[in-house]
UniProtKB/Swiss-Prot annotation:
Phosphoprotein as UniProt keyword: yes
InterPro entries: PFN, PFN_euk, PFN_sf, Profilin_CS
GO MF annotation: an example: actin monomer binding
GO cellular component: cell cortex; cytoskeleton
Complex and partners: Occurs in many kinds of cells as a complex with monomeric actin in a 1:1 ratio.
Disulfide cross-links: 13-115
Residues modified to Phosphothreonine: 111
Descriptive protein name: Profilin-3
PTMs per UniProt: Phosphorylated by MAP kinases.
Species of provenance: Olea europaea
Note: The variability of the residues taking part of IgE-binding epitopes might be responsible of the difference in cross-reactivity among olive pollen cultivars, and between distantly related pollen species, leading to a variable range of allergy reactions among atopic patients.
Gene3D superfamilies: Dynein light chain 2a, cytoplasmic
Amino acid sequence: MSWQTYVDEHLMCEIEGLHLASTAIIGHAGTVWAQSTAFPQFKPEEITGIMKDFDEPGHLAPTGMFVAGAKYMVIQGEPGAVIRGKKGAGGITIKKTGQALVVGIYDEPMTPGQCNMVVERLGDYLLEQGL
């Protein structure tokens, strides 16, 4: 299965009539493997900051997490495994696998829990596959 298929069929899937606003699978070095059409362009320093937070949980909390220049308040995630952020009526979930970051961005009426479920389910599957 191609990385784009994972994005199109597993991340952009319908949940109770709703979809994530945008999604992507990104390598640890910041290379985009696949993305939805509306996915914002991450800056290299943003990926560096996200990866550092996975290695040193709490690194982003004081300053916030920036994604394509937009600031997200970091909320409780799973240290070393999941980073969650909130911005206005939406937010972001990032799940780290062995080789990639699975990213989902949502806006209301989708809930944080729905976004977490979609992103973390695919991330857990990729981890099980050794990816």
